[in-house]
Regions:
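Fe(II)/2-oxoglutarate oxygenase catalytic core
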Residues: 2-246, 250-278
């Protein structure tokens, strides 16, 4: 075993991993230990990591193929690294609503590795929600109802042309013509690696249940969002330069708080491809 330390966070999920330098090539045994921790907890954090873009990519590629984000600005010279930025003169941040990344894709992303490059003096935290717990704390009747349901996820209303979000973020978000895809996924999934059941909808990209109208879907989606985001189901992470959050998109939501007017927040994000959900 390695000498890494794994400390739980104060919230409903996630651990901080210490005594590891991700700028170095990880041994197979150390990587296996980190991977097992990630699968078990669904959310891992690192501190004080001085990573170049190449270091960031080297770590990410240990986990699988890299998704090239078609909407976000890229780090110069690195198409596989998305830039998540909010400058002092900008009002709207990226990711400022509960969501999980790429649920609008036919094969959603496995995970996202976010590295803090510049953080505000105060604020800019990220909230995470535990989708295992969201499922487990539903009533038996609700579980039975949702087990056979599927939902439609879309990027059109967020990244598409003439949407308020895309227009307000035009310097950071592009290619609205690519926001044409929808995807149908089960509402309850079995995680392909942990084998635990999780609720798989989110308020940003899930638009309706299959066979239901938007109007019929909204009350149930709203209820599930309220249920999921109860305080006892969430974790809050405070960033500093060199912090990394790596979340499993199949069992988490996240929400970037926009509470730092007049300051810069700059992150580099790499997204790892996943597999079909069932």
């Amino acid at each position: 075993m390695s000498n890494i330390l794994i400390n739980p966070t104060s919230g409903s999920m996630g651990v901080e991993i210490h005594n590891v330098d991700l700028s170095n090539e990880l041994s197979d045994s150390l990587f296996s230990e980190i991977r097992e921790t990630f699968i078990e907890h669904g959310l891992i954090f690192f501190r004080d990591q001085e990573l170049t873009p190449d270091d960031h990519l080297s770590f990410a590629k240990r986990w699988g193929e890299i998704n090239i984000n078609r909407f976000f600005a890229k780090v110069e010279g690195y198409d596989q690294i998305a830039e998540v930025r909010k400058d002092p003169d900008q009002k709207i941040n990226i990711g400022g609503a509960w969501h999980t990344d790429h649920s609008y894709d036919q094969i959603p992303a496995m995970g996202s590795i976010l590295l803090a490059k510049e953080t505000p003096k105060i604020g800019g935290d990220t909230l995470f929600a535990n989708m295992y717990k969201a499922y487990e704390t539903l009533s038996n009747g609700m579980k039975k109802t949702l087990e056979t349901m599927k939902a439609c996820h879309s990027s059109r209303h967020v990244f598409g042309a003439h949407t308020g979000y895309a227009e307000a973020s035009s310097q950071r978000i592009s290619n609205p013509e690519l926001a044409t895809q929808d995807a149908i996924h089960p509402v309850i999934i079995t995680h392909p690696e942990s084998k635990r059941k999780a609720l798989y909808i989110n308020p940003e990209f899930t638009v309706n249940f299959e066979g239901w109208t938007l109007e019929e879907s909204k009350p149930l989606l709203d209820y599930l969002t309220e249920h999921t985001t109860q305080q006892e189901n969430t974790t809050r992470f405070q960033w500093e330069p060199g912090s990394i959050a790596f979340w499993d998109n199949r069992c988490t939501w996240h929400f970037a708080l926009n509470d730092y007017p007049g300051e810069t927040r700059l992150m580099h994000r790499i997204t790892v491809e996943g597999s079909a959900l069932s």
